[in-house]
């Protein structure tokens, strides 16, 4: 008893009082309160320990960032997010995709030749009437007839489109901005100066504007049946011109069912 009085007092006297109260309770009640207290302590530990770990990690990252403000890539590797190898691999794959943009720009100045067979929806139309509609369409497009044989050949000059030039410039700007963003992370020595490469994007529009002018040939052959009715119209030429002719003359491609688009006006 003397030893207990000489010993230093506890820092939390209420804990000692609680222990005394618990010991004075019945056995079952005492066991229930001890179990409850252990559960509360376990939950508290589960909450406090992760918070302390996160707090210490945040402090370490902040101190490291103050010492190395320009090394975002190294910081990410140090914190276990990504490795240098993964960043360089991603950069390599992204750079490889850039030639796809160059391919798009080159294809924009070249025509895609297609050959399609159409049928007339209105069976009451005479072949001469359909031929007049075809001639009127290509005449308005500044095409001239160069051959009046069995296959009629129309020749015209394609001019560049301002909308197409603007679209190519915009797509190139977005692509180069993405490349600049990747380079600022991978090679931070140049900082935001990498974004100056977007100044090259207007070159895409200039390239298209200078190369888009070209001559086009459209060949049309009308197949007339034994009863004097028009059976088929075979058209060969630039896919854009062929599609515009199909829409204006309300033709259907043979063996195909045409479904109007959501934003296409009904005639």
Swiss-Prot record:
Effect of disrupting the coding gene: Seedling lethal when grown on soil. On agar plates supplied with sucrose, seedlings grow very slowly with a chlorotic phenotype. Deficiency in the accumulation of the subunits of the cytochrome b6f complex and lack of covalent heme binding to cytochrome b6.
Domain of life: Eukaryota
Ranges of the Lumenal topological domain: 45-84, 186
Entry's transmembrane regions: 85-105, 165-185, 187-207
Stromal side of membrane: 106-164, 208-267
Keyword annotations: Chloroplast, Membrane, Plastid, Thylakoid, Transit peptide, Transmembrane, Transmembrane helix
GO biological processes: cytochrome b6f complex assembly
Membrane topology: Multi-pass membrane protein
Signal peptide annotation: none
Localisation per UniProt entry: Plastid, Chloroplast thylakoid membrane
GO cellular-component term (any): chloroplast thylakoid membrane
Residues annotated as transit peptide in the record: 1-44
Job of this protein: Required for the biogenesis and accumulation of native cytochrome b6 in the thylakoid membrane. Controls the conversion of apocytochrome b6 to holocytochrome b6. Required for covalent binding of the c-type heme to cytochrome b6.
Protein name: Protein COFACTOR ASSEMBLY OF COMPLEX C SUBUNIT B CCB1, chloroplastic
Encoding gene, per UniProt annotation: CCB1
């Amino acid at each position: 008893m003397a030893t207990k009085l000489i010993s230093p007092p506890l820092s939390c006297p209420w804990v000692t009082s609680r222990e005394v109260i618990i010991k004075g309770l019945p056995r079952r009640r005492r066991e229930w309160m001890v179990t409850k207290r252990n559960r509360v302590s376990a939950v508290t530990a589960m909450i406090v320990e992760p918070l302390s770990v996160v707090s210490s990690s945040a402090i370490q990252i902040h101190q490291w960032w103050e010492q190395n403000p320009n090394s975002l890539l190294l910081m990410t590797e140090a914190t276990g997010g990504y490795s240098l190898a993964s960043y360089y691999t991603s950069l390599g794959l992204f750079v490889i995709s850039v030639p796809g943009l160059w391919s798009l720009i080159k294809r924009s100045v070249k025509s895609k030749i297609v050959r399609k067979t159409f049928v007339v929806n209105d069976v009451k139309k005479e072949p001469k009437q359909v031929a007049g509609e075809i001639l009127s369409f290509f005449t308005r497009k500044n095409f001239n007839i160069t051959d009046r044989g069995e296959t009629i050949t129309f020749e015209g000059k394609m001019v560049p489109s301002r909308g197409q030039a603007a679209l190519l410039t915009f797509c190139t700007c977005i692509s180069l901005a993405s490349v600049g963003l990747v380079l600022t992370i991978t090679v931070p020595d140049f900082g935001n100066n990498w974004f100056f490469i977007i100044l090259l994007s207007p070159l895409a529009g200039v390239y298209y504007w200078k190369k888009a002018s070209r001559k086009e040939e459209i060949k049309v052959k009308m197949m007339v049946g034994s009863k004097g009715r028009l059976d088929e119209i075979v058209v060969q030429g630039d896919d854009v011109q062929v599609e515009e002719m199909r829409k204006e003359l309300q033709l259907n491609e043979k063996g195909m069912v045409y479904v109007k688009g959501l934003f296409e006006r009904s005639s």
